[in-house]
Amino acid sequence: MSIGKIKESDLCKSLAVFMEEVYKDCELYYEVKTIRDRKIDCVCKTKDGETIAIEMKLHANLTVLYQAFNNLECCNYSMILIPAGCLRDFSRSFIKTLCLKLGIGLLLIDRYNKVTLETCMTKNENPSNAGYVKLFEQQKNFVGGEASSACWSEYSQTIYEITNWLKEHESGNLTDILKQINHHYSSVSNGKQAIMRYIKRGILKQFEIVDLDGIIKLKKEE
């Protein structure tokens, strides 16, 4: 593995292998949105329900450590994964010491794609902002570490569920649809108004309005 050519997205596969070996039957979610529109490269949910935030970077610096430390506000544990080759001898001990003091797990990946845990993690029993971390099935298919990757939000999930509902029913009134799905709006009426407004503005291009009372359907693919 060439350090000069490796990308953050290349770290995903090796991370997945390591996490499955250590945490059997865990689930990995990528590009997870959290508080203040920050996002975590990867969140691992163990079969016991604990969460581990992992930042995958090509270099170790104070910014990465700051991100990882902040992730403890949202998850039970926090790690960083970096290539072993990016650390010089003098900085390796420095980074390890900082990780130990901050309670952050340091994962190093070598040229053979093997991942090792260099420092132990400190558990945060009750992350103050855990409620801001929303994990959706779709995030399992994202590519962690890609700057262009969009976060899957509660809004994304709502639109996804509306789309699936319309695929089964062809058309329907938004009031009825929102009553039958999980959505993030404070009320059905607020959700209906917002979605109708987005359709009219062309933001939700996959839907079209059948009736101004709130009946919508999926646009046919051209």
Residue ranges and their predicted role:
Residues L15, C42-C44, D48-A60, S78-I80:
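Conserved catalytic cores of phosphodiester-cleaving nucleases, focusing on short active-site segments
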Residues L98-K217, E221-E222:
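Non-catalytic C-terminal interaction segments of nucleic acid-processing enzymes
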Residues M1-K39, V43-D48, S93, K101-I104, ...:
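Acidic-basic catalytic patches of nuclease active cores, encompassing PD-(D/E)XK
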Residues E20, F69-L72, L166:
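N-terminal cationic-hydrophobic initiation segments that often serve targeting/anchoring roles
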